[in-house]
From Swiss-Prot:
Protein purpose: Involved in the post-transcriptional modification of the uridine at the wobble position (U34) of tRNA(Lys), tRNA(Glu) and tRNA(Gln). Catalyzes the conversion of 2-thiouridine (S2U-RNA) to 2-selenouridine (Se2U-RNA). Acts in a two-step process involving geranylation of 2-thiouridine (S2U) to S-geranyl-2-thiouridine (geS2U) and subsequent selenation of the latter derivative to 2-selenouridine (Se2U) in the tRNA chain.
Name of the gene encoding the protein in the UniProt record: selU
Catalytic reactions of this protein: 5-methylaminomethyl-2-thiouridine(34) in tRNA + selenophosphate + (2E)-geranyl diphosphate + H2O + H(+) = 5-methylaminomethyl-2-selenouridine(34) in tRNA + (2E)-thiogeraniol + phosphate + diphosphate; 5-methylaminomethyl-2-thiouridine(34) in tRNA + (2E)-geranyl diphosphate = 5-methylaminomethyl-S-(2E)-geranyl-thiouridine(34) in tRNA + diphosphate; 5-methylaminomethyl-S-(2E)-geranyl-thiouridine(34) in tRNA + selenophosphate + H(+) = 5-methylaminomethyl-2-(Se-phospho)selenouridine(34) in tRNA + (2E)-thiogeraniol; 5-methylaminomethyl-2-(Se-phospho)selenouridine(34) in tRNA + H2O = 5-methylaminomethyl-2-selenouridine(34) in tRNA + phosphate
PANTHER family linked: TRNA 2-SELENOURIDINE SYNTHASE (PTHR30401:SF0)
SMART domains in the record: RHOD (SM00450)
Protein name in the entry: tRNA 2-selenouridine synthase
Record has Transferase as a keyword: yes
GO molecular function: transferase activity, transferring alkyl or aryl (other than methyl) groups; tRNA 2-selenouridine synthase activity
Keywords: Selenium, Transferase
UniProt key word Mitochondrion: no
Catalytic residues in the record: 95
Length: 369
């Protein structure tokens, strides 16, 4: 039999399969990328047992748990645990603290299925704390540099080209702007933090000691950056990415119109996908109406409506350039120019995409071991 484990680092580095036996409501608040939820109790059962524990103590709660999870219910859950254990002989199971729930699942697997299956000592809480400390330690011990630039200049492409980058927007499943939503939902806050920490852990294991991040605000869609990381970002050196206006318009047209429409249609189907995509763009523009001002908003909204009608009718996207150009010239570029004033003394390099990528690679290579 394999031993229970406290080797949290290896679990994440090796993407070890984990069976989370917490209730679904706990799992959906936060889990880990390589886990599946095979609960001992469902949400209602957990609530009843919790109430019994508060009112009558541990023994009464345990007795109620055995009463609720018995017969066909127990057999069904045992079959799910057995299937996971057989499919993942190198895996582990865990509950919140590695205590009673995971021990009961271990006991039932042994007694009723003849399977010895190890658990994670300390459970979810210990794994979560380990990842929290992973991020904190990286902020304390590693070097960081930010990539900034005007909207549409290709910062995400720079991040993707580097092997020492942390893709904050990728982990958040959001592009970070008022128009940044994707066709699929964002992760829960805890899931976002866990994914980022695992990325940091794996890169540091490969020897990365200098990380490149996109210059972001504290909030990426609905996901908040870890506070210690965001605080550090207020002082990290900055590399400024430059690109021509027409190139930026073309990139935004591709990302936020052509590709995003396709993304929505893949998720919900062609007809409904275009309708959802159209409503999303209009809602996003309406979301910044106060910052645009009424007259400017009405003008850009009219162009957007016309562009969507043409796109829906014959696939043409050229009219979209009108509202994109207007947003850049009249909203995003002035806003970035204002924000950049406070960061100017931190800019250590400026260049186009190829120059910035080359500079950042050289910067990493020159870092002392």
């Amino acid at each position: 039999m394999r031993d229970n484990t406290q080797h949290y680092r290896e679990l994440f580095l090796e993407d070890t399969p984990l069976m989370d036996v917490r209730a679904p409501v706990e799992y959906h608040k936060g889990a880990f990328p390589h886990t599946v939820n095979r609960p001992l109790m469902n949400d209602i059962e957990r609530q009843k047992v919790g109430t019994s524990y508060k009112q009558h103590g541990q023994q009464a709660a345990i007795a109620l748990g055995h009463e609720l999870v018995c017969g066909a219910v127990k057999a069904e859950r045992l079959a799910a645990w057995k299937a996971f254990a057989e499919a993942n002989p190198n895996g582990y199971l865990y509950c919140f603290r590695g205590g009673l729930r995971s021990q009961i699942v271990q006991q039932w697997l042994k007694q009723d299925a003849g399977i010895d299956y190890p658990r994670v000592i300390g459970g979810y809480k210990a794994l979560r704390n380990f990842l929290f400390e992973t991020t904190r330690a990286a902020v304390d011990e590693c070097d960081f540099v930010l990539v900034g630039g005007l909207t549409g200049c290709g910062k995400t492409e720079v991040i993707a080209a580097l092997d020492n980058s942390l893709d904050l927007e990728g982990h958040a499943n959001h592009r970070g702007s008022s128009f940044g939503r994707r066709a699929t939902p964002q992760p829960a806050q805890i899931d976002f933090e866990n994914r980022l920490a695992i990325d940091i852990l794996k890169k540091r294991h490969r020897g990365v000691g200098q990380f490149v991040l996109e210059d972001e605000g504290r909030i990426v869609g609905s996901c908040s950056l870890p506070l210690e990381l965001y605080q550090g970002m207020q002082g990290y050196p900055l590399v400024w990415l430059e690109d021509g206006f027409e190139q930026r318009v073309a990139r935004i047209l591709k990302d936020y119109v052509i590709d995003l429409r396709s993304e929505f249609e893949r998720v919900v189907g062609a007809e409904e996908g275009f309708a959802v995509f159209s409503a999303y763009l209009q809602k996003s523009l309406a979301g910044i109406v106060k910052r645009l001002g009424g007259e400017r908003y009405q003008r850009l909204a009219a162009i957007l409506v016309q562009a969507l009608e043409e796109q829906g009718r014959d696939g043409s996207v050229e009219t979209h350039r009108g509202w994109i150009e207007g947003l850049l010239k009249e909203y995003y570029d002035p806003m970035y120019a204002f924000q950049r004033q406070s960061k100017e003394d931190r800019v250590e390099f400026r260049g186009n995409q190829a120059e910035v990528i080359a500079y950042l690679r050289q910067r990493q290579a020159l870092r002392p071991s």
